[in-house]
């Protein structure tokens, strides 16, 4: 992007104000990958609320400012100069990250770095031992190759996941129109939209995309769709008048990339390319760097623990080796062997596969995860900042209430009309239905007779679409009904009159009268009426009926609904005979003295599943905050209807109204709910915003700009929350990128929102987030179990080296054997724990505290290493010494035997019975010991995976066979063990030997001990919550 500080950028707010530099004052949270100070400063500057006044200037002032003409446009020569100065009217993409850098990042995560270090150590050890002719030389080489292979394979998988998502800026390019109609030197012609410059005079019509930020000079019946930019679900009227000090609120500015729905417009280009609102959002979205995910932080924390312990143990035994007489090189080999033995080689694959399985499970429930780590992040979420339009609501206007015969009725918009609350034979209803059907320009797209009415495609704006569908549901065949009342003339809706009028002939050929019907802003329609239709009778519109109208109007408006008024007038055949030439310019027909028929209110209704989803979030301790660009009254009404503002909760304004006191006399802390609009947010300093978020549990932000959404997310993060942001519009993309996890809508979502997000809801259903939260929490619990299972065997893999060094026994366990444990036999049970059901209703627990509830905590490490791991070590050594003794090598003889055992030249070493062993025989016996120790670990690990099914409940309560994948994994583990032991050729390939059956039985008592020991631990945890036992032994 160019130098943004040289451009005149703007947002909802005007002027610096007390909070104008809010974003710049706020301290930045540390981001993944960091960034230069200048880049951060530039991003902060972009987030400031900046000022323009083009919408407030007169036409003459605009002509002077941009050296243009409001009738002839720019001169061709000046346009060429401006294009050369400002560049094309296009979004300039940021410098992309090279693909090799993306791939390198996948190879350089926390666990990956640890494994690279381990592989390097193995290669160094290989080089040292090769120079000494050591028999374990090849083992270290194989181990290094295996470690590198694991890192590369998992890195390729991660890179593939990232490769599937596209660059954010590319999605904004999809919004750029290709052609624009421009007037230069008085000539009208079409050019590529990227050739537009400031000061160009352009024309648009319904169906065109706005080619730049336009100051409107003339408009007729123009409406634009700003929903993807501001979040407003209603089509917005555009006219030449300045109606608001804010450029996003005024009617005389149309924004780059929004859609012109109907009417015609002529205007001046005031901003192009990166200087437009959409350009600024693109800069914000691409400038915001991703936060580290909680799972990435947890893995870093875990790597720190593992690396620290590995170095501690390695250094300790390096010193011991030096003290007992080993050479420096030999002691260094021991140090490296211990460090490598401490690295859980299979953990990286386990975490990747577990997250992938959960992502696949979520995909089957309409949640597509772009970033694997986002799976767990959603489970950690404590705050959801949700957009309203299209996320909480259906993004389609629907008739909600009707007022006629002095009663408010709830509209039934279902196909069977079984819930209709009024008499459809009422004469007043028939008249109202006739008016709303005839005074309507919307039409169904042809060929949809078999499609349910709510799902039919309609050509027309949102309000008229809602009225047409309601008419179709209540009348049936609304289009045919219109045909029976042919339209004679029409005045389209415009912002000056605020009404739409049409005149029709009657369906009865014997009745020569005309019917005039009108709809529009209720107060404007009512002022043109002199009578009101009540129970089919026209009554004078006296003060009593005006008060009844006002009461109903305020009641419907207070629900956040859009209200329209309807009226009619029969034109007598004497003054307006058949064939009369109605003239809309001369208005040769009456437009007052009409008969008021009723009111119809519409709203973009909440999705049916949202209230239950919000309630589940509340139960799970997750706070749902609405952040929308829509009107505060509408936002509050929707928030109340879906449960974001709970029943009985009051805002400061509600309390003031109830107590009949001014708002400033109410203690704000007494209000549980709070609705803040964009202008108020602009005047708040950072501490006030944080205090508001802390004080009011139920928050709604309305009329917010994309910059403000970003600031709201940062403020929540500053309070220590893990923030999820949902949205579907272009305006949501910066906040989606900034959030700990961004969730975009798959159907209604813009490409920009989808590319900025970490997760996409294919069904656009907010309720799917609850499923994601549940799966995220479950995978955290199950990852904890998988890691505990994976770490336990580190001790029985490590202790053979410790005994080998300190007691000088023949090596009980080889590197290749460890590799088979880590990457072959144990990987399947470890992954199978990802399929374990939740122990309790995890959606009734509060979100985990990232600082306190760690993936790997002290109780988990202590229990896995020093309790279960110690038992497994005893099992391994028991089996090892049993196998050695049965072959003639009693335990006491084994002590101090290492040097002689490994002597290549000694071919007559005697055992406890006096039998002589050659080096080759001793080597095969060592392979037998490797296999015996391997089998001991595997038998104990079967017990270990069974106890890891639960952390608190008894395994009997959870059930042994509910997780069928785990049962299959155990069977597979045993089969692999048998294959490695008894397959011919294994001694020469992987150092495995056939072993006696009784050596399989030696570790069984230890497996039973592990199971019983853990059941006692769980019983204590359940019986003594909060006790020392619970705190130290519950992980």
Curated annotation (Swiss-Prot):
CDD domains, sorted: P-type_ATPase_Na-K_like
Cross-referenced InterPro entries: ATPase_P-typ_cation-transptr_C, ATPase_P-typ_cation-transptr_N, ATPase_P-typ_cyto_dom_N, ATPase_P-typ_H/K-transp_N, ATPase_P-typ_P_site, ATPase_P-typ_TM_dom_sf, ATPase_P-typ_transduc_dom_A_sf, Cation_transp_ATPase_P-type
Catalytic activity: K(+)(out) + ATP + H2O + H(+)(in) = K(+)(in) + ADP + phosphate + 2 H(+)(out)
Membrane topology type: Multi-pass membrane protein
Keyword Thylakoid: no
Compartment list: Apical cell membrane
Active site (record annotation): 387 (4-aspartylphosphate intermediate)
Lumenal side: 120-142, 320-331, 804-813, 878-929, 983-997
GO cellular component, one term: extracellular space
Main location: membrane
Tissue: Expressed in gastric parietal cells (at protein level).
Database matches in PROSITE patterns: ATPASE_E1_E2
Sequence ranges on the Cytoplasmic membrane side: 1-98, 164-299, 350-783, 835-854, 950-963, 1019-1035
Annotated binding of K(+), by residue: 340-341, 343, 345, 797, 822
Region called Disordered, residue ranges: 1-41
Modified residues annotated as Phosphotyrosine in this record: 7, 10
Gene Ontology BP annotations: intracellular potassium ion homeostasis; intracellular sodium ion homeostasis; monoatomic ion transmembrane transport; pH reduction; potassium ion import across plasma membrane; potassium ion transmembrane transport; proton transmembrane transport; regulation of proton transport
Biased composition (Basic residues): 26-40
Family assignment from sequence similarity: Belongs to the cation transport ATPase (P-type) (TC 3.A.3) family. Type IIC subfamily.
The protein's name in its UniProt record: Potassium-transporting ATPase alpha chain 1
Organism: Homo sapiens (Human)
Gene designation per UniProt: ATP4A
């Amino acid at each position: 992007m160019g130098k943004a500080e040289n451009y005149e950028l703007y947002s909802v707010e005007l002027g610096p104000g007390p909070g104008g530099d809010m974003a710049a004052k706020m301290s930045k949270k540390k981001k993944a990958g960091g960034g230069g100070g200048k880049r951060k400063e530039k991003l902060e500057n972009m987030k400031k609320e900046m000022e323009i006044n083009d919408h407030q200037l007169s036409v003459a002032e605009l002509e002077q400012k941009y050296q243009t003409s409001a009738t002839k446009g720019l001169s061709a020569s000046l346009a060429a100069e401006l294009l050369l100065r400002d560049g094309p009217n296009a979004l300039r993409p940021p410098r992309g990250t090279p693909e090799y850098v993306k791939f390198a990042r996948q190879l350089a995560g926390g666990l990956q770095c640890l494994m690279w270090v381990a592989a390097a150590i193995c290669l160094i050890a290989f080089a040292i031992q090769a120079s000494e002719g050591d028999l374990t030389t090849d083992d270290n080489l194989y181990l290094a190759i295996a470690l590198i292979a694991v890192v590369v394979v998992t890195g390729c998988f991660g890179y593939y996941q990232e490769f599937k998502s596209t660059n954010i800026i590319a999605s904004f390019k999809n919004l750029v129109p290709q052609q624009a109609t421009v007037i230069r030197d008085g000539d009208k012609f079409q050019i590529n939209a990227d050739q537009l410059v400031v000061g160009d005079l352009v024309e648009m019509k319904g169906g065109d995309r706005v080619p730049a930020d336009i100051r409107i000079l003339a408009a007729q019946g123009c409406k634009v769709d700003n929903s993807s930019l501001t979040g407003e679900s209603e089509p917005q009227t555009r006219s030449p008048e300045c109606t608001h000090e804010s450029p996003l609120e005024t009617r005389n500015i149309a924004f780059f990339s929004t859609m012109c729905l109907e009417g015609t417009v002529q205007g001046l280009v005031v901003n192009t390319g990166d200087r437009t609102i959409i350009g600024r959002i693109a800069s914000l979205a691409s400038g915001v760097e991703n936060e580290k995910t909680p799972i990435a932080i947890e893995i870093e924390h875990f790597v720190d623990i593992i690396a620290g312990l590995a170095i501690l143990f390695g250094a300790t035994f390096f010193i011991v080796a030096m003290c007992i007489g080993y050479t420096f090189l030999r002691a260094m080999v021991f140090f490296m062997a211990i460090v490598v033995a401490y690295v859980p080689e299979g953990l990286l694959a386990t975490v990747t596969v577990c997250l992938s399985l959960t992502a696949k499970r979520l995909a089957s429930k309409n949640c597509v995860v772009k970033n694997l780590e986002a799976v767990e992040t959603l489970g950690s979420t404590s705050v959801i900042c949700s957009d309203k339009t299209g996320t909480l609501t259906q993004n389609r206007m629907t008739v909600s209430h009707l007022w006629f015969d002095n009663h408010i009725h709830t509209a039934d918009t279902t196909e069977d009309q079984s819930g209709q609350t009024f008499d459809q034979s009422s004469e007043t209803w028939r008249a109202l239905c006739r008016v709303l059907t005839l005074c309507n320009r919307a039409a169904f797209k042809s060929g949809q007779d078999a499609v349910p009415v709510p799902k039919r495609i309609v050509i027309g704006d949102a309000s008229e679409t809602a009225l047409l569908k309601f008419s179709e549901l209540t009348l049936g065949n609304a289009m045919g009904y219109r045909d029976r009342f042919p339209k004679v003339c029409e005045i389209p809706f415009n912002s000056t009159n605020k009404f739409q009028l049409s005149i029709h002939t009657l369906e009865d050929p014997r009745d020569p009268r005309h019917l005039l019907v009108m709809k529009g802003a209720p107060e404007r329609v009512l002022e043109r009426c002199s009578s009101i239709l009540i129970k089919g009778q026209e009554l004078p519109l006296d003060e009593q009926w005006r008060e009844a109208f006002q009461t109903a109007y305020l009641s419907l408006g207070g629900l956040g609904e859009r209200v329209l008024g309807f009226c009619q007038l029969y034109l007598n055949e004497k003054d307006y005979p058949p064939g009369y030439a109605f003239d809309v310019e001369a208005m040769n027909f009456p437009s007052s003295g009409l008969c008021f028929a009723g009111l119809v209110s519409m709203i973009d209704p909440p999705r049916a599943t949202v209230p239950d989803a919000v309630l589940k979030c509340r139960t799970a301790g997750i706070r749902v905050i609405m952040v929308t660009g829509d009107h505060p009254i509408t936002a509050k009404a929707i928030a109340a209807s879906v449960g974001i503002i709970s029943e009985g909760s009051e805002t400061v304004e509600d309390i003031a109204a109830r107590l009949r006191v001014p708002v400033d006399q109410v203690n704000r802390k007494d209000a549980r709910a709070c609705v803040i609009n964009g202008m108020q947010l602009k005047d708040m300093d950072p501490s006030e915003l944080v205090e508001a978020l802390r004080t009011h549990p139920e928050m709604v932000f309305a009329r917010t700009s994309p910059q403000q959404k970003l600031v709201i997310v940062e403020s929540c993060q500053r309070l220590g929350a893990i923030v999820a942001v949902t949205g579907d519009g272009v305006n949501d993309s910066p906040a989606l990128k900034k959030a700990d996890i961004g969730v975009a809508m798959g159907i209604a979502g813009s490409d920009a929102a989808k590319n900025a997000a970490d997760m996409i809801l294919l069904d656009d259903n907010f309720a799917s987030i609850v499923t994601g939260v549940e799966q995220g929490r479950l995978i955290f619990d199950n990852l904890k179990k998988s890691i505990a299972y994976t770490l336990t065997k580190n001790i029985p893999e490590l202790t053979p080296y410790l005994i080998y060094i300190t007691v000088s026994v023949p090596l009980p366990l080889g590197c290749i054997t460890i590799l088979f444990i880590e990457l072959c036999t144990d990987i399947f049970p470890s992954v199978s724990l990802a399929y374990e059901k939740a122990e309790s209703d995890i959606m009734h627990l509060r979100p985990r505290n990232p600082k306190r509830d760690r993936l790997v905590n002290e109780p988990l490490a202590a229990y896995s290493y020093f309790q279960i791991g110690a038992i497994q070590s005893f099992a391994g050594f028991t089996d090892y010494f049993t196998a050695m003794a049965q072959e003639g090598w009693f335990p006491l003889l084994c002590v101090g035997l290492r040097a002689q055992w490994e002597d290549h030249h000694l071919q007559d070493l005697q055992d406890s019975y006096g039998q002589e062993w050659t080096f080759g025989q001793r080597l095969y016996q060592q392979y037998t010991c490797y296999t015996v120790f391997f089998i001991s670990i595997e038998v104990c690990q079967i017990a270990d995976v069974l106890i890891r099914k639960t952390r608190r409940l008894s395994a009997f309560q959870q059930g042994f066979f509910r997780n069928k994948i785990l049962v299959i994994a155990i069977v597979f583990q045993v089969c692999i063990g048998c294959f490695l032991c008894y397959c011919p050729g294994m001694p020469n390939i992987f150092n495995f030997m056939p072993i006696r059956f009784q050596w399989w039985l030696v570790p069984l008592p230890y497996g039973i001990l592990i199971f019983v020991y853990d059941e006692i631990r769980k019983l204590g945890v359940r019986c003594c919550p909060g006790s020392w036992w619970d705190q130290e032994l519950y992980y």
